Structures are given as C-alpha cells and as structure tokens.
From Swiss-Prot:
This is Shikimate kinase. GO terms for biological process: amino acid biosynthetic process; aromatic amino acid family biosynthetic process; chorismate biosynthetic process. Catalyzes the specific phosphorylation of the 3-hydroxyl group of shikimic acid using ATP as a cosubstrate. One of its GO terms (molecular function) is magnesium ion binding. Monomer. The gene is aroK.
C-alpha cells in the first residue's frame, strides 16, 4: 500500500511542477495568532518565487493605523469588515502566498473566496507553544484579558472546527520555521498531485463505455 505522506523531494525539483499545477491559485495560511503564518509564509514565497502578503500589514496600510488602534477606535466588527475587503482584494493578485489574521478564515465570505481561488493551509501549534510565542507580543487585542491562556483555549474551541475545513493541516510546533515551510510546499505538491489524479480518474470513468 502506498504511503500518503509527501515524498521528501528537494524543493528546487518540485517548484516548477507545483507552480504549473497551482493554476493561478493562492496559497493561504490560516491559524491562530502565534503559529508563525507570516514568517513561514515569507519563506514559502521566497522558495517558490511568489509574492507574499500579510493581511494584517495590508489592513494597517489601508487604515493608516495599527491593528490595536483599529480595535480600540472602531471595535472588532469594523475591523472584520475592513479585513474582508482587504483580503478579497488581495486574492485578485493570484498567484501569491497570503498569511491571514487568526479570525479571517472564520468569515464565511473570506472562506468561500479562499476555497474558490486558493489552497488553504492550517498551521497548527499546541497551546503551550502558542502562549510562549504570543507572550512576546503583549499588545494583541484579543488577549487583553485577565487570563490570556483561558482566552486562547476559548479561541481554540471556537475556531478549530472551522479551521479543520482547510485543504491541508500542518502541525508545526515541533519543527523549525524553515522545515515547516518545506513541509507545506511538499504537502501542497502532494495535494495537487492527488487533485490531478482524481480529475484523470473522473475523466476516464466518464469516457468508459464498457
């Protein structure tokens, strides 16, 4: 029985095939704050020679203020509305690698656009690793609570069932960022190969007159 694990082929050898099979789609990284979407996304984009965008950075450019200031001044609902406009606009620049904010994929309209025009990749990290990482940036709006760890656990409970709708899930807490980026690329190539095989099998079945 053949393994479903992506083969460890050098990235340089699968790059051109991946870009051809990607067919003008976006690679969209989703997951909670602190999983490393931006850092890993930049590395993926560099290895594949694709443009990289961070939706939070693009939101700050559009609003001319920080995410923290946006939350404080206009509230979360206004931030989410701007987030949707920015991400849907960024998706027009395909192919690209896009790192999204933790709540973006929860938005149904964003989720539909990602599934229509991209491949969604959930970067998953355990709670302790997350808390260790987010503690380095104490200004995160959603963690301005008396018990940030409890808040993070609630976010996991709320968001994980929706994150699970992603095309791919990559557990990234045990690997360094470069290795995770390489794992993402290999998993995307494996996904595209499977997608192509499924199309070929479907086409063969449709043309079968036996």
């Amino acid at each position: 029985m053949k393994s479903n694990r992506p083969k460890h082929i050098p990235i340089t050898k699968i790059k051109n095939q991946l870009l051809s099979s990607l067919d003008n789609r976006a690679l969209v990284l989703i997951g909670l704050m602190g999983v490393g979407k931006s850092v890993i996304g930049k590395r993926i984009a560099t290895m594949l020679c694709l443009p990289f965008y961070d939706s939070d950075q693009e939101i700050e450019k559009a609003a001319q203020m920080t995410i923290t200031e946006l939350f404080k001044t206009y509230g979360e609902s206004e931030f989410r509305a701007l987030e949707q406009r920015v991400i849907l606009n960024l998706m027009k620049n395909r192919p690209l690698v896009l790192a999204t904010g933790g709540g973006a994929y929860i938005n149904e309209d964003i989720r539909k656009a990602v599934h229509k025009n991209g491949i969604s990749i959930w970067l998953k990290v355990d709670l302790d690793t997350l808390m260790q990482r987010v503690s380095k940036r104490p200004t995160r709006p959603l963690l301005q609570t008396e018990n940030p760890k409890e808040t993070m656990q609630k976010l996991m409970k709320q968001r994980y069932p929706i994150y699970a709708k992603a095309n791919l899930t990559i557990n990234s807490h045990k690997e360094n960022r470069q290795t995770v980026a390489q794992n993402v690329i290999r998993s995307v190539q494996h996904y595209l190969d499977t997608e192509k095989n499924d199309r070929n099998n479907q086409h063969a079945n449709q043309n079968c007159h036996c």
